[in-house]
């Protein structure tokens, strides 16, 4: 059985190599993709919340006060709601950082340091954060939250450093 998994592992590795190549074809690409993928994470956070609402007997009359049904959600559904809200908060911090880095690259050229890995890692960490929060795995959730916030901070620092150095 382990031998049968080898082609799958090789295919996944080749896919990841090609994906990284696609995401880094131009100096600005990682930051643009980071912005797009981070927005995708916000949209993805709706899925577990929608699943939870479907178990809480959501009706059209709940549209009058959608937050009022929160108490009817199962515990994991309440965590899904919090994860969804936190996704918006993380995006509002990350989007300006990604735009700043994108602007810095367009004005000054490629950024140094950890800017590209931070730009690509932030959406991945935020995507892992969602199931970690919904499944109530605090250590993983905390690591993903801190890692994503650190990636956003790196983008702010590298973008500002480039713009200040070029001024």
Report each predicted region and the residues it spans.
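Core segments of transmembrane alpha-helices
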Residues: 8, 39-42, 85-101
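Short alpha-helical packing/oligomerization segments
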Residues: 96-124
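Cytosolic, membrane-interface loops and tails of multi-pass inner-membrane proteins
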Residues: 50-81
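Transmembrane alpha-helical segments that form the membrane-embedded catalytic/substrate-channel core
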Residues: 37-55, 123-130
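Juxtamembrane boundary at the C-terminal end of a transmembrane helix
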Residues: 155-167
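Interfacial loop-to-transmembrane junctions
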Residues: 127-151
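Small-residue-rich segments of transmembrane alpha-helices in multi-pass membrane proteins
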Residues: 7-11, 144-158
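Long, highly hydrophobic alpha-helical transmembrane signal-anchor segments
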Residues: 2-49
């Amino acid at each position: 059985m382990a031998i049968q998994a080898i082609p799958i592992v090789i295919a996944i590795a080749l896919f990841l190599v090609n994906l990284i190549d696609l995401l880094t074809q131009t100096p600005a690409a990682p930051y643009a993709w980071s912005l797009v993928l981070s927005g995708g994470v916000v949209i993805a956070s709706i899925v577990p919340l929608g699943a939870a609402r479907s178990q809480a007997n959501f009706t059209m009359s709940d549209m009058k006060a959608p937050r009022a049904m929160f108490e009817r959600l199962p515990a994991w559904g309440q965590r899904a709601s919090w994860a969804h809200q936190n996704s918006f908060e993380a995006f509002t911090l990350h989007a300006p950082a990604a735009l700043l880095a994108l602007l810095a690259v367009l004005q000054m050229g490629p950024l140094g340091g950890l800017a590209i890995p931070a730009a690509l890692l932030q959406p991945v960490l935020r995507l892992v954060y969602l199931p970690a929060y919904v499944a109530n795995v605090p250590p993983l959730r905390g690591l993903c939250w801190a890692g994503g916030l650190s990636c956003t901070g790196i983008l702010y620092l590298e973008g500002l450093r480039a713009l200040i150095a070029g001024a």
